[in-house]
Design a protein with these regions (language model features):
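N-terminal leader/targeting and accessory segments in enzymes
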Residues: 1-86, 90
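Phosphate-binding loop of NTP-binding sites
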Residues: 84-171
Length: 171
């Protein structure tokens, strides 16, 4: 996807990105990196790591000053931290629009309830999957997320992969 299409801007009209990441360790060559850390030192360290891993563009909040020596383009995005999910959904084809998504909140038992919901909907004929602390994917085939709470980009990417694999319900 062209970065200009993702951001609805004329900036960098010809720059394609092949993925998005907001965790520098998950950047692959050709990705756009969403630098959303509110701590300057962390943000700079993560940007450096993302660029080393092949990020072709860095998205930062519009309050951030772009350094004149940046080795890849930086794009300032208004309210980036609150728009992460929106941008990731757009990039990955808005997967939740065509999935039945069941969210579970609370203090205790979220993982257990989500697993039970995925299991029950599977028994009722849905092609169900889970996303959360234990990973993502169909039950019995969960893939590790690398962290207990997936970020907005990871959620959208995982939902898109599950949808492409035939899943219709995600808990």
């Amino acid at each position: 996807m062209k970065i200009a299409e993702l951001l609805d801007t004329s900036t960098l009209k010809d720059l394609d990105i092949s993925g998005l990441a907001e965790h520098s360790g998950m950047v692959k060559p050709g990705y756009g990196f969403l630098a959303v850390s509110d701590k300057l030192w962390d943000r700079e360290k993560h940007i450096d790591q993302a660029v080393e891993r092949g990020a072709t563009v860095v998205l930062v909040d519009d309050s951030i000053t772009v350094p004149p020596t940046a080795s890849v383009p930086w794009v300032r995005v208004r309210n980036l931290s609150t728009r992460r999910g929106e941008l990731a959904a757009k990039f990955y084809g808005d997967p939740s629009r065509t999935l039945n998504c069941v969210g579970v909140t609370g203090t205790n038992g979220k993982t257990s309830i989500a697993i039970h919901v995925a299991d029950m909907t599977q028994l009722m004929g849905s092609t169900s999957a889970y996303i959360g602390t234990l990973g993502w994917g169909p039950l019995g085939q969960l893939q590790d997320l690398g962290m207990t709470t997936p970020n907005a980009v990871m959620i959208q990417k995982s939902l898109a992969r599950m949808r492409a694999g035939g899943t219709d319900t995600v808990a």
